[in-house]
Amino acid sequence: DGRRGRRGRYRDRRGRRGGGREDVEPQVSEDDVLIPVAGILDILDNYAFVRTSGYLPGPNDVYVSLAQVRKNSLRKGDHVTGAVRQPREGERREKFNALVRLDSVNGAAPEGGRARPEFNKLTPLYPQERLRLETEPNQLTSRIIDLVSPIGKGQRGLIVAPPKAGKTMVLQSIANSITVNNPECHLMVVLVDERPEEVTDMQRSVKGEVISSTFDRPAEDHTTIAELAIERAKRLVELGHDVVVLLDNITRLGRAYNLAAPASGRILSGGVDSTALYPPKKFFGAARNIEDGGSLTILAAALVETGSRMDEVIFEEFKGTGNSELKLDRKLAEKRIFPAVDVDASGTRKEEILMPGDELQIIWKLRRVLHAL
């Protein structure tokens, strides 16, 4: 059959062109010049890349074959160091250099990756250990959060904020307090669909990892950095670390998934696709306190009172999923009373685990007094 012959020839040619590249490990000869590389591993459907310039794809990313991924039990979000071969003169350049040597995975030998547990199989518990935010007497925001909505390691908290209510200042205050009081925690600030000047401000004022995608980028970039950032956090938790992720904000992340996700045909009110809300829920649901050490704390800002039906629908989906809520009040913010915290509407579930009994009784008494005002 002539057609089969043509197809066979095409298939052979495709194999020679590099279609079979994903299952072949690159070979190194003695006279090759090796260049060291490091970055976060991003595993896609048929191939993987080491993102060398942050969490977004870049021109200097390094290709990793699936054979290397399987052989070393690599996972998305692993921090990888290794080497690539410098192309020789006259040699055809590949679009991406291939990883020829793997030196370390998350700061340890590559062989150690096989024994680590899987994040989804770890046992989640209520937060047991308090993340105290109070630092200096003049820092009121962190003190009020400690009183009204205490945070523990493994908390899944929502910061419910109308526009211009000071949520960015609250997030910066939380980030700086964690850096001062809990230096053992790995801090990640994820800014999605954010203003460029806000990103710069956050990078300069926060001593932690700031991962950002500004509003002038496509929705796919927003979803890419969010997914890779949360996978990075999960890999650290698997190693027993305490990780704190501050997300600004989950409403815009939901909007980005709504734009980027393929249409399912089922549209909720407000123009939200029914499948678009699952990925941000997966992001937020990753927060947990692990039984045998390690925790992932996620504090995410959610926008309300924006006048958008879509924002309302997204917020309603997340309303009951957190175990802590800090609500900001627009009326207080308009009077320039900061931090504009709505004390009655804010609180933490199972706060008695985080606080000693005598402190809890005093705080309840304070709440009753404030409620009566």
List each language-model region with its residue ranges.
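Acidic low-complexity intrinsically disordered regions
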Residues: 1-47, 51-59, 76, 89
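Short nucleic-acid-contacting surface segments enriched for D/E, G, S/T with interspersed K/R
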Residues: 69-81
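P-loop NTPase nucleotide-binding module
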Residues: 137-194, 230
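P-loop NTPase catalytic core
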Residues: 175-177, 187-373
